[in-house]
Amino acid sequence: MGKILLSILLIGITIAPALLMGADKFVNIYSARKEALILPLLKRFKKETGISYRLVTGKADGLLKRLEIEGSLSPADLFITVDAGRLQRAKQAGVLQPIDNPTLEQRIPTSLRDRENYWFGMSQRARTIIYNTKTVDATNLSTYEELASPKWKGKLCIRSSGSVYNQSLVASMIEVNGIEKTESWARGLVRNFARPPTGGDTDLLKATAAGQCDIALANTYYLGRMINSKISSERKAAQNLAVFWPNQGEGDRGVHVNVSGAGVTKYARNKKEALSLLEFLVRDKSQKWYAEVNNEYPVVEGASISKTLESFGTFKADSINLT
């Protein structure tokens, strides 16, 4: 009990109302996704399956720490978070278990799930080049590697090296190009900064639209949010921006993609229900919901995408395994 109380004190959490409701079948979820991006699907899941949910939301690192502290006393059955890097940390921390599930293995490509099935991607996002259409000719863009070229000196906006999104991109670069070349590339990016790394992806895109920089590395769904924003200034800023898909040449690896995903916890008491929820989240209807609501790409091939995503065009994605 002391461990559980300590873990609650360590992090700020939100518990959905369903936590207070008794049910014969239920699944306990620790989610680093915002409640608005998971709760509507949980309500559909309960309506269709009769399985209730107990949802705890919070910061990814805090929830992971909580799982570690709680150990075998943890009530969590499922851990949901964004970025493969965080999912790998959960695996390495020993709080997840491997899963043998034909439905998940069939619907989710091997590149978008853990090699040993400790976690599975639920939706994917592309971290790509977004540029100011008034200051950049797209024919001058080509690859991630080329962003380190001196011609982009003083023109690049990027998040800090502490961003897990950038860490995952760098890890993919190391896998392809090796450590030495990737270190040299990173130094080139630093030389090309238009300003010190500050803020999140939305801040980068606003700065690019305003002409403070010409190009940014960002996840596409942030641009999707701006395009569909209720704030007129954000919609106006988005009109100055466009997506460029790098590394599309013949034989090249394609665009770096990452996932939001989930894994069944090591001590899950409701494993069957947790697996039912995972299967529900990769159904076509659920995949379409993520695409329409948050402009994330489906992990299931052939699932529908939003009109906003369609406007970005098609691209070849990097097939490197995210683990």
Language-model features: locations:
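Early extracytoplasmic/lumenal segment of secretory-pathway proteins
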Residues: 23-88
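Periplasmic solute-binding protein
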Residues: 84-95, 113-142, 170-171, 257-263
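Alpha-to-beta junction loops
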Residues: 51, 70-79, 95, 152-154, ...
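Short beta-strand->loop
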Residues: 30-33, 96-105, 115-116, 119-120, 131-133, 139, 145, 232-256, ...
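A structural signal for short loop-to-beta-strand junctions that line the ligand-binding cleft
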Residues: 74-79, 97-129, 145, 156-158
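Mature extracytoplasmic/periplasmic domains
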Residues: 260-319
